[in-house]
């Protein structure tokens, strides 16, 4: 994103002071950090993003899936979700070298989660002074209106140039979604 923004600013037909960063989903979660690390963007757009940490979101999604399972499947899957919860809880104490050789969620390296968790999105959101636009569908199966969209509203309540738009009937990809099911 930083390199793409630099290329855009170098284009003679583009006003360098009008380059915005749009992040979708995890990109929306990371956008404030990307900007803080040198983006110099005119503003930020969070499209189906979250102000929560990645581990909290993944655990919530797994627990929701677990709750929706028939009892016999839930009994078999519950230990896997508990193991994931324990892996995430152990990350802050995990040595860097161990994190580089440990997998979480199949083949994802623990160091990735360990690094990303040292940069909570809320810390960056509290420091934002540039324009912010938050967009979310109310049928998003991956996010929560209360825990994500409303949290953005609360965190950015005093921000003079923050706008929020919740779109009825749209899912995570901003497509019409009658029920909000992941399959839609």
Predicted regions and their residues:
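Alpha/beta-hydrolase active-site loop
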Residues: 1-11
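Alpha/beta-hydrolase fold nucleophile elbow
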Residues: 14-23
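Catalytic nucleophile serine of serine hydrolases
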Residues: 23-25, 48
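Catalytic histidine neighborhood in serine/cysteine hydrolases
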Residues: 156-179
């Amino acid at each position: 994103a930083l390199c793409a923004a630099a290329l855009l600013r170098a284009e003679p037909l583009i006003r360098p002071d009008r380059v915005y960063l749009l992040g979708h989903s995890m990109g929306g979660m990371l956008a404030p950090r990307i900007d803080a690390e040198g983006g110099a963007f005119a503003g930020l757009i969070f499209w189906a993003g979250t102000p929560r940490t990645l581990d909290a979101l993944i655990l919530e999604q797994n627990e929701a899936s677990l709750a929706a399972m028939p009892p016999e499947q839930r009994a078999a899957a519950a230990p896997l979700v508990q193991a994931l919860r324990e892996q995430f809880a152990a990350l802050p104490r995990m040595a860097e070298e161990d994190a580089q050789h440990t997998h979480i969620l199949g083949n994802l390296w623990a160091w990735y989660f360990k690094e990303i968790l040292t940069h909570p999105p809320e810390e960056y959101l509290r420091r934002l002074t540039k324009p912010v636009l938050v967009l979310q569908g109310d049928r998003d199966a991956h996010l929560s209106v209360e825990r994500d969209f409303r949290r953005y509203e609360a965190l950015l309540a005093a921000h003079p140039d923050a706008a929020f738009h919740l779109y009825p009937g749209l899912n995570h990809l901003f497509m019409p979604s009658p029920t909000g099911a992941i399959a839609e």
